[in-house]
Amino acid sequence: MGSRNIVQQQNRAEAAVPGAMKQKNIAGEKKNRRALGDIGNLVTVRGVDGKAKAIPQVSRPVTRSFCAQLLANAQTAAADNNKINAKGAIVVDGVLPDRRVAAARVPAQKKAAVVKPRPEEIIVISPDSVAEKKEKPIEKEKAAEKSAKKKAPTLTSTLTARSKAASGVKTKTKEQIVDIDAADVNNDLAVVEYVEDMYKFYKSVENESRPHDYMGSQPEINEKMRAILIDWLVQVHHKFELSPETLYLTINIVDRYLASETTIRRELQLVGIGAMLIASKYEEIWAPEVHELVCISDNTYSDKQILVMEKKILGALEWYLTVPTPYVFLVRFIKASMTDSDVENMVYFLAELGMMNYATLIYCPSMIAAASVYAARCTLNKAPFWNETLQLHTGFSEPQLMDCAKLLVAFPKMAGDQKLKSIYRKYSNLERGAVALLSPAKSVFVFLIELLMNAIEKIQCSLFFTSEIWCRF
C-alpha cells in the first residue's frame, strides 16, 4: 500500500534559538497537525543534528471518501511497483522523497485495504485423471474392435442377403414424382389450383353414375346388340365430327337408361339417337339438328319420336348429366404419362374398344382409363410401363390394373376379325398414327409369366437355403 508521509521541514533558525521560538512552535504544532497522514507507514527523518527522529503518528476518523482515496492510492502504487520493480522507493503525493531520507516501515496499527493478486490457475494431475488417460486408449481399442466385428460379415447377414435376393427384393432408387401441372401455371383454363381437388371429387362420385349389370333385366336385348348400337354411334359421331366427350357421354347415357328402363328391340336405335342428341346439346357448341338425325337413321324414326325419347331419357336419369366418364380421366392420365402422340392414340383406341364391349362395364371409369394407359405403354414398349407419377395421379398400382389391362389388350385382335370395324378403321388412319395396325402387347402376358416364375423361384430358393442352414449346423 502506498502511503503519504509528510516530512516536516526543520527550521534551522528555530533550532538555533529554541527558547525564543517556543511560543511559535506551540502555535506551529497546532497548524501542522498531520490530520491526513497515514498511520501505517511512518518514516524516520534525519534531523539537523544528524540523528534520526521518528515522525509522530497521527490518527484521524476514516470516512468513505478517505477509504476510496486510500484504495485508489493502493491500486496506483501496486501498478507502479509491478512496472518499475523498485525496492525502497516511497512516493509521497506523487513526488519521490530525497535520497538522503531512508525509508523505514513501521508495523501498521490498523489493517489497510489490501488488493490481492489474482491467483494463478494451477492444474493438478491427480492419480484418477492419470488412470482415465490410461483407460482412454483401451476404450478406443475396444471401440475399434467392435466396429471391426460389425463390419465383418456374419452367417446371419449373409443368409438374410441371400433370402432377399431369392425373394426378388431389390434396392432401387426412389423415383422422382414429376409435377405435370408446372407448365400450365399461367394457363387460367388449366385451373392448376383446383385440378387435384376436382379429380378427387370425380373419383369419389364415379361409382354413383356407373351403370350396373342390366342384361339380365332386358329380355329382348343382348350384349351383341349393344355392341352393334355403339359401333353405329361411333360412325355417327365421326360423320358429324363431334368431340370425344360427346361419344363417351352418349355411351354412358345409353347404359344408364337401359339399366333403369326395359327397352324393346325396335327402340334400341331410338335410344341411341336420343342419347346422342342429349350429349351433343350438353358438350357441343353446335349440336346436330333433329332432322339430320332422322336422315342419318334412314328415316326409321320421326322427329316427334326422337324428341319424345329425349324427354323420356332425361326423366329416367333425373337430368343428371354431369358425370365423370372415362374420357375425363383419360385426359389427366395421358398428361401424367408424358409420352408422344402414338401412345395417346393407342390409349384412345383401347378405351373406345373397351367401351364397346359389355365386359368392361364391371370396372369403374378411372380403372378403364388407367388400364388403357398401361396397356398402351406395354403395346408400344414404353418402359417403364408404370411409374410413381402415374400411380400418384391414377391411384392404382400395377398389379391392380392387370385384370382390366388383359381384357383391353385382347380387344384389338377381336376388332380386326369381327364385322364391327368402325373403331378399327377409325384408328387405322394415318392421322391417328395407324395404331390399330400394331400387334397387341405381349408385355402384359410376359409380366404375368414373370410373376409366376418369380413365385416358383422363391419357393425353390427358400427350400435350398433351409437345407443349407441345416447342413451347417
From Swiss-Prot:
Basic and acidic residues compositional bias, start-end: 134-147
CDD domains assigned: CYCLIN_AtCycB-like_rpt1, CYCLIN_AtCycB-like_rpt2
Domain of life: Eukaryota
Signal peptide positions (record): none
Function: Essential for the control of the cell cycle at the G2/M (mitosis) transition. G2/M cyclins accumulate steadily during G2 and are abruptly destroyed at mitosis.
Self-association and partners: Interacts with the CDC2 and CDK2 protein kinases to form a serine/threonine kinase holoenzyme complex. The cyclin subunit imparts substrate specificity to the complex.
Protein name: G2/mitotic-specific cyclin-1
Organism from which the protein derives: Antirrhinum majus
